Amino acid sequence: MSETINTAAQFPSFEKPTVQFNERGWGPCELPDTFKDVPYQPFSKNDRLGKICDWTSTSNNDKKYQNKYASSFGTGNQYSYYHEEDETTFHLVDTARVQKPPHQRGRFRNMRGRGGRGRNPRGGLNNHHHHGMTTLNGKNVKARDTRRGMGKKFGHRGPPPKMRESSVAVRADWASIEEMDFPRLIKLSLPNIKDGVDIATCGTLEYYDKTYDRINVKNEKPLQKIDRIVHTVTTTDDPVIRRLSKTVGNVFATDAILATIMCSTRSNYSWDIVIEKVGDKIFMDKRDHTEFDLLTVNESSVEPPTDDDSSCNSPRNLAIEATFINHNFSQQVLKTGDQEAKFKFEEPNPFISEDEDIQVASVGYRYKKWELGSDIVLVARCEHDGVLQTPSGEPQFMSIKALNEWDSKLANGVEWRQKLDTQRGAVLANELRNNACKLAKWTVQAVLAGSDQLKLGYVSRINPRDHSRHVILGTQQFKPHEFATQINLSMDNAWGVLRCIIDLVMKQKDGKYLIMKDPNKPIIRLYDIPDNTFDSDDSDDGEGDDGEGFQQVYNYANNSNKI
């Protein structure tokens, strides 16, 4: 059987290509379809594809014309190498040159010849003459400090901020009614609110000891631990407010609660206030066994304390320390003793009975009312800490508070022992920057109470690592209204914020509500909560409704109301 062999299939065929004839020049007349829309960039085969770093080349002495011998190819980014790995953990470093102030420009312009050979104009050794040693001139030192984190103020992306915890856990059965952001609250204003009118006055005050005005850094005085009872009673537990609510007012609160609401736009930490609406009356209360009465420390600082709870410099331990200092200082600067004169109000202290034999702190209570318009009458309990005898014989009531220094290095503050006597304004300005909310609250409380003076004490630790021993370094006094102007505190805005919240609650039905500052956002939220929320019967052994009880850290403060 014969097979036919195809000889044409054994040899490759040759097809004549199409040759374009260019009459006006050389090269193809048309671009092939395979090369259309392909970007082209001049390149050289000697160029590296993405050179990362070169540690072998010597520094170029001719810095003015250092690029005159460089290749002109490869200047684009078509052949650059890009690493596709996630780089979100890297921190950006600002390499922009900081402009010098006018008094530093041209300082070393005419000193180039003084350094000599092998030296820079400032006298330092140049690196290109000494390859075996590493020298740091002024620019390198600045760059090194920038890499170490000195340039955070230029917008570097540092580590993520620590998330703060909420003062109370929001439950699923709570209904959110309103969110009020700080930019909107700052614009509120309620002007022409007259001073409050006294309804009742209770308690006994001791006179201020003027010898504490002569204390300075060189003549410091130890802070004593005074065993006295301080009552921090909420609104609905006050027997005087219960009596007055039957005849006077329709909004009831304490000065601490009002100050928290009025200064809410300066707060960073979370806080909450319980509001009960019964008919046309509103009662503002604080929750039991909470940290509402603790004083914050460096709340408005650029770098607030973030240590863990085991450290004495944690936010909570610093708050307990500041509260302990404030209570003891306000009682130590008074003239105590049975032989000393005392100022007594019309009624005795409403929180102690006649058969109780306890030593109570010097506190005077003023129950005042304010007309806020639209038939809203506010009744609040305000406090005085002491009284001062004037040469004319008229008493001046005082609000006595204490600022505390814990560790100036960790707090990015100024050394009180170095600046307090000579630059007290700088110390106060630093405190206004770090504790803006706390100072604003004290000022509002003094204005509401009608205090004639706001006395501030400067108390510091004996040792920065010892949070149990303190000394008094000095005192300073202000008039509350003048101090409010000095710290840019607008009482019209404070009354406007309070009136906004009152109007919002007045529109709701009868029940229990809660306003809370968001722990990480400048927002205040209003919640509608069940009537049995935060009832004392639901908690045992002093634990709050959120399951976490208030526990004291200091051994000398086993009682939350005892100092």
Swiss-Prot record:
<keyword id="KW-0963">Cytoplasm</keyword>
<dbReference type="GO" id="GO:0001732">
    <property type="term" value="P:formation of cytoplasmic translation initiation complex"/>
</dbReference>
<comment type="function">
    <text>mRNA cap-binding component of the eukaryotic translation initiation factor 3 (eIF-3) complex, which is involved in protein synthesis of a specialized repertoire of mRNAs and, together with other initiation factors, stimulates binding of mRNA and methionyl-tRNAi to the 40S ribosome. The eIF-3 complex specifically targets and initiates translation of a subset of mRNAs involved in cell proliferation. In the eIF-3 complex, eif3d specifically recognizes and binds the 7-methylguanosine cap of a subset of mRNAs.</text>
</comment>
<dbReference type="GO" id="GO:0098808">
    <property type="term" value="F:mRNA cap binding"/>
</dbReference>
<dbReference type="GO" id="GO:0003743">
    <property type="term" value="F:translation initiation factor activity"/>
</dbReference>
<dbReference type="InterPro" id="IPR007783">
    <property type="entry name" value="eIF3d"/>
</dbReference>
<feature type="region of interest" description="Disordered">
    <location>
        <begin position="98"/>
        <end position="136"/>
    </location>
</feature>
<keyword id="KW-0396">Initiation factor</keyword>
<dbReference type="Pfam" id="PF05091">
    <property type="entry name" value="eIF-3_zeta"/>
</dbReference>
<feature type="compositionally biased region" description="Basic residues">
    <location>
        <begin position="100"/>
        <end position="120"/>
    </location>
</feature>
<dbReference type="GO" id="GO:0002191">
    <property type="term" value="P:cap-dependent translational initiation"/>
</dbReference>
<dbReference type="GO" id="GO:0005852">
    <property type="term" value="C:eukaryotic translation initiation factor 3 complex"/>
</dbReference>
<comment type="similarity">
    <text>Belongs to the eIF-3 subunit D family.</text>
</comment>
<protein>
    <recommendedName>
        <fullName>Eukaryotic translation initiation factor 3 subunit D-1</fullName>
    </recommendedName>
</protein>
<dbReference type="GO" id="GO:0016282">
    <property type="term" value="C:eukaryotic 43S preinitiation complex"/>
</dbReference>
<keyword id="KW-0694">RNA-binding</keyword>
<dbReference type="GO" id="GO:0006446">
    <property type="term" value="P:regulation of translational initiation"/>
</dbReference>
<keyword id="KW-0648">Protein biosynthesis</keyword>
<dbReference type="GO" id="GO:0033290">
    <property type="term" value="C:eukaryotic 48S preinitiation complex"/>
</dbReference>
<comment type="subunit">
    <text>Component of the eukaryotic translation initiation factor 3 (eIF-3) complex. The eIF-3 complex interacts with pix.</text>
</comment>
<feature type="region of interest" description="RNA gate">
    <location>
        <begin position="291"/>
        <end position="305"/>
    </location>
</feature>
